[in-house]
């Protein structure tokens, strides 16, 4: 089946499915991605063995329900999709979902799993975090604060990496001054890669078995590799009890791109 046929078939199925559905304005995605106090969940799924045995026309119809669920919940949640297949051995797809209420994320995931497409998804992992105002930045030097405001390089950053982190009990027992000094060293090591590697931090303590979820986007995986090597050399790294497990690597995709990838 050609790409044009796939797009046409998906469009027809989706259009018919939403003929009588109300149109919602959609949540303010940029606000959710920049505000503090926003929940972020990472839902990782693998497709079951039955998926590959389905006829392409059936896969198209079931993938159209994915688009329908995303559209249904866009008023309350911001949803980003990533194709992991071929780059990560843990799963096939990743959903990063933001909302001001965690129950809105839960509602989306419940509807996703109960959809015709979702019935082929096996949950491979689920992580939850919360965005907060920078904890240590107020104690940084003025120059470092200014450096942190540098804009990232223009252009798409197609690769996404998700790395969960857990700190040791010793870290949480350190006094504030020592923590600030070590995080400032950590930040100094990361500054050379600030423009080519976008980073977002989620706080997970109490919401998950993690302390942090670190999310990265880049078009230069070699820079990300160098960034990780640099961060492993700073003093703060000795207090990291768990990093990765899993480490997720994928490609950013729109809903339509994801559908085209999975229908093949």
Regions found by a protein language model. Give the residues of each.
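A common structural junction motif
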Residues: 112-120, 232-240
């Amino acid at each position: 089946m050609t790409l044009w046929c796939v797009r046409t078939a998906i469009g027809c199925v989706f259009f018919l499915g939403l003929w009588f559905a109300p149109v919602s304005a959609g949540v303010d995605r940029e606000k959710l991605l920049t505000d503090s106090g926003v929940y972020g969940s990472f839902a990782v799924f693998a497709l079951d063995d039955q998926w590959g045995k389905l006829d392409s026309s059936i896969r198209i119809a079931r993938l159209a329900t994915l688009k329908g669920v995303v559209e249904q919940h866009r008023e309350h949640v911001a949803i980003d999709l990533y194709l992991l297949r071929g780059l990560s051995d843990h799963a096939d797809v990743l959903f990063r979902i933001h909302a001001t209420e965690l129950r809105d994320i839960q509602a989306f995931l419940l509807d996703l799993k109960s959809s015709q497409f979702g019935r082929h998804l096996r949950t491979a992992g689920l992580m939850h975090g919360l965005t907060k105002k920078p904890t240590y930045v107020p104690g940084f030097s003025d120059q470092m604060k200014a450096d942190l405001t540098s804009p990232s390089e223009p252009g798409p950053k197609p690769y996404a990496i998700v790395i969960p982190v857990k700190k040791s009990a010793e870290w949480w027992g350190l006094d504030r001054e020592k923590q600030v000094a070590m995080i400032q060293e950590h930040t100094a090591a990361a500054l050379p890669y600030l423009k080519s590697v976008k980073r977002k931090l989620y706080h997970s303590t109490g919401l998950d078995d993690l302390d942090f979820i670190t999310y990265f986007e880049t078009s230069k995986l070699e820079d990300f590799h160098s960034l990780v090597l640099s961060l492993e050399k700073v003093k703060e790294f000795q207090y990291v009890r768990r990093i990765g497990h899993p480490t997720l690597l994928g490609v950013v995709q729109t809903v339509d791109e994801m559908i085209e990838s999975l229908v093949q």
